[in-house]
């Protein structure tokens, strides 16, 4: 097909995609009801939680102590920065 100035380009027959409807895969998943899918979901949750490596009591105590100490240090740091900014603002603005 030759394109002239001002002509309308029409798509060729081989350019068009075939009309294909997406078919749903029936299989086992498509036929389960909502309660069975919910039960499967909870079974999968339990199966995944069994794979988790839980910390021992000693490790848990250590991790908790480290987190609490870190939080206390961060609270102190933010308090000091806030105290410094408030005194600087009082000095500048009276």
UniProtKB/Swiss-Prot annotation:
Name of protein: Protein translocase subunit SecE
Subcellular location(s) per record: Cell membrane
Region ranges (Disordered): 1-32
Subunit structure: Component of the Sec protein translocase complex. Heterotrimer consisting of SecY, SecE and SecG subunits. The heterotrimers can form oligomers, although 1 heterotrimer is thought to be able to translocate proteins. Interacts with the ribosome. Interacts with SecDF, and other proteins may be involved. Interacts with SecA.
Alphabetical list of InterPro entries matching this protein: SecE_bac (IPR005807), SecE_sf (IPR038379), Translocase_SecE/Sec61-g (IPR001901)
Record-annotated membrane-spanning stretches: 65-85
UniProt gene name: secE
Cellular component GO terms held in the UniProt record: plasma membrane
NCBIfam families named among the record's database cross-references: secE_bact
Comp. bias regions, Basic residues: 22-32
Family to which the UniProt record says this protein belongs: Belongs to the SecE/SEC61-gamma family.
Pfam families: SecE
The entry's keywords: Cell membrane, Membrane, Protein transport, Translocation, Transmembrane, Transmembrane helix, Transport
The keyword DNA damage is assigned to this record: no
Topology of the protein relative to the lipid bilayer: Single-pass membrane protein
GO molecular function: protein transmembrane transporter activity
PANTHER family recorded: PROTEIN TRANSLOCASE SUBUNIT SECE
GO biological process, one term: protein targeting
Function in brief: Essential subunit of the Sec protein translocation channel SecYEG. Clamps together the 2 halves of SecY. May contact the channel plug during translocation.
Top-level taxon of origin: Bacteria
